[in-house]
């Protein structure tokens, strides 16, 4: 079971990725984790990646695809894997295909931008302890105050509306072509494209996912 996950920041992708990993016993493959591991291990691709990063440049698709090929050859990927954060572009998707890496399911979590902004802009944090709240879903006992210390809660920069909307803009620019690409792949019978309503309760989405992937 080889799965690609698509979903905007705040769409609940991470929660459902954990569910899939635990339910089906397949590892999540993150390109960032792979890069760090390869550099630390000093593999040939790791050395190439390190020299590129040290020069302040972006790691090429060729190196990333090579790392993915090495990673999925490992024993824990025998039953499949979950690709998160890759591919981000059409050339990367083409690269996977050219390397003979078949994708069984492309899973998209669909949540309207305004809902994501509400989810993220409603977050409040007590920075010294790391405790987090939400104005709607998990409000503090007293508005704007930490439950334990009574200290002021803040909105983290990442959760500010303008930051969230900027990240969503980047996501849509990158991902819209991929959604079209994998839609065509599904029509051609090369993969299955599954779309879920990410505004539903977490357990409900998990149940739908389990049924669709079973």
UniProtKB/Swiss-Prot annotation:
Q: Where does ATP bind?
A: 10-15, 123, 132-133, 200
Instruction: From the Swiss-Prot or TrEMBL record, state where the protein is found.
Output: Cytoplasm
Residues reported in the UniProt entry to bind AMP: 31, 36, 57-59, 85-88, 92, 156, 167
Origin: domain of life: Bacteria
Q: Name one GO molecular function term.
A: adenylate kinase activity
- CDD domains assigned: ADK
Q: Give EC number(s), comma-separated.
A: 2.7.4.3
Q: Name one GO biological process term.
A: AMP salvage
GO cellular component labels: cytoplasm
Q: Which UniProt keywords apply?
A: ATP-binding, Cytoplasm, Kinase, Nucleotide biosynthesis, Nucleotide-binding, Transferase
Which pathway, metabolic or otherwise, does it act in?
A: Purine metabolism; AMP biosynthesis via salvage pathway; AMP from ADP: step 1/1
Work out whether the entry's keyword set contains Repeat: no
Q: What does this protein do?
A: Catalyzes the reversible transfer of the terminal phosphate group between ATP and AMP. Plays an important role in cellular energy homeostasis and in adenine nucleotide metabolism.
Query: Can you state the subunit structure given in the record?
Result: Monomer.
Q: Which family does it belong to?
A: Belongs to the adenylate kinase family.
Please report the name of this protein according to its UniProt entry: Adenylate kinase
Q: Which organism is it from?
A: Vibrio atlanticus (strain LGP32) (Vibrio splendidus (strain Mel32))
Designated gene of the protein: adk
């Amino acid at each position: 079971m080889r799965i690609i996950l698509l979903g905007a920041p705040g769409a609940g992708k991470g929660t459902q990725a954990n569910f899939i990993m635990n339910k089906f016993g397949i590892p999540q493959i993150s390109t960032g984790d792979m890069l760090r591991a390869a550099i630390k291990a000093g593999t040939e691709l790791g050395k190439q990646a390190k020299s590129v990063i040290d020069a302040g440049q972006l790691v090429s698709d060729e190196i990333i695809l090579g790392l993915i090929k090495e990673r999925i050859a490992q024993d824990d990927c025998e039953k499949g894997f979950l690709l998160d954060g890759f591919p981000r572009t059409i050339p990367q998707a083409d690269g996977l295909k050219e390397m003979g890496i078949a994708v069984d399911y492309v899973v998209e979590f669909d949540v309207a931008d305004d809902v994501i902004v509400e989810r993220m802009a409603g977050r409040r944090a007590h920075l010294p302890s790391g405790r987090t709240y939400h104005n709607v879903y998990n409000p503090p006992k007293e508005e704007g105050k930490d439950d334990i210390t009574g200290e002021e809660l803040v909105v983290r920069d990442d959760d500010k509306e303008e930051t969230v909307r900027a990240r969503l803009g980047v996501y849509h620019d990158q991902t819209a072509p991929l959604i079209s690409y994998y839609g065509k792949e599904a029509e051609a019978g090369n993969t299955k494209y599954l779309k879920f309503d990410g505004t539903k309760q977490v357990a409900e989405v998990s149940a739908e996912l389990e049924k669709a992937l079973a």
